[in-house]
A protein has these predicted regions:
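Conserved strand-loop elements at the edges of beta-sheets that form or border functional pockets
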Residues: 43, 52, 187
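Structural alpha/beta surface segment adjacent to cysteine/selenocysteine redox centers
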Residues: 46-138, 168-173, 198-206
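Hydrophobic single-pass membrane-insertion segments
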Residues: 20-30
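A short beta-strand-turn-helix
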Residues: 31-48, 73
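C-terminal cap of thioredoxin/glutaredoxin-like
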Residues: 1-21, 135-206
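Short secondary-structure boundary/capping elements
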Residues: 32-33, 63, 159
Length: 206
């Protein structure tokens, strides 16, 4: 009997230690999911937070963007989207810098939508050709000379490095990769993402 009680006690202790480790690992994981520099769309107080690791040269990322926006539109004020960069396509880092430079002029989201819409014209044989993406930025009210200059800023390269480091720590090796309130998708697909978002909405809002 004493041996059984000792075994049970050890199991309970091990469970408590494991729970503590998981609990204390959460803040670090949250930091790796969304950094202060991450572009965000939606109410900052929304209780459902979608984090997407994306590559502007990724065709599937382009396809998913309007789907994610439709989820947000269906639940106004309840969902926030943060974007992280995983420019796995050759040359895609330069397009990321273009977006970040547009962001410095307050035009990030219009620039992103224009760049994604024009993606078939500047992605050639799975390679991002940043020089072909410039026409997509016409008509957005951007100072394109300043965009070109700002693309060389070291802090823009640092954002990409940080996002790639976080992607590696989280096991992200393809795009798009989604996390909803810290939970990864069990399988990839539109319905799977919607299901994860619906679950988070129920948990947060009832």
């Amino acid at each position: 009997m004493r041996r059984i009680l000792t075994t049970v006690g050890l199991l309970l202790f091990a469970a408590a230690v494991l729970s503590a480790l998981v609990y204390h690992s959460k803040p670090e994981q949250r930091a790796e999911l969304a950094r202060f520099h991450s572009p965000s769309l939606g109410d900052a107080n929304a209780k459902v937070h979608i984090v997407e690791f994306f590559d502007p040269a990724c065709g599937t990322c382009r396809d998913f963007y309007p789907f994610v926006k439709s989820l947000m539109d269906a639940h106004p004020g309840r969902i926030r989207l943060s974007l992280r960069y995983a420019p796995f396509h050759r040359g895609s880092g330069e397009v990321v810098k273009m977006l970040e430079a547009a962001r410095r002029q307050g035009k990030y989201w219009p620039a992103l939508e224009a760049i994604l819409a024009a993606q078939p014209r500047w992605v050639v044989n799975h390679t991002a050709r940043a020089e072909l993406a410039w026409p997509a930025l016409d008509g957005l009210g951007l100072d394109l000379g300043r965009v070109k200059a700002d693309m060389g800023l070291p802090e823009l390269a640092q954002i990409i490095r940080q996002d790639l480091e976080d992607a590696a720590k989280l096991g992200v090796d393809k795009t798009p990769e989604f996390f909803v309130n810290g939970r990864p998708m069990p399988r990839f697909g539109y319905e799977e993402l919607k299901g994860l978002v619906d679950r988070a909405l129920r948990d947060a809002y009832g």
